[in-house]
């Protein structure tokens, strides 16, 4: 893809949305990988009085895998967008990112952490917007 093509509004927003998802989900996912014990301890306390108290470990594992995969796909998708002008990988990254945010939102609601759930809404809007723009044909 040429620089002129990349700077066209649709292509540029596709690239930037995918880059945002890559940064957000890779950083968060890798934090969970490198501080798994700390995250598990915090989440165990967070969900202690919720219906999810017995499944914190599988939730953390599935959330970490989904989050890290979303970030990796978004990162690879951003590079693929810039080099080849195709956005299939970025679109899959956005799909997984959206799924991950919905998973987190459900967990926060079940833990009755309504402020925590509300703080996820802007991330959902970013993910949904990325899905929409990545689904658009390149100009």
PLM segments and residue spans:
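Extended, low-polarity transmembrane helix blocks
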Residues: 1-31, 61, 65-139
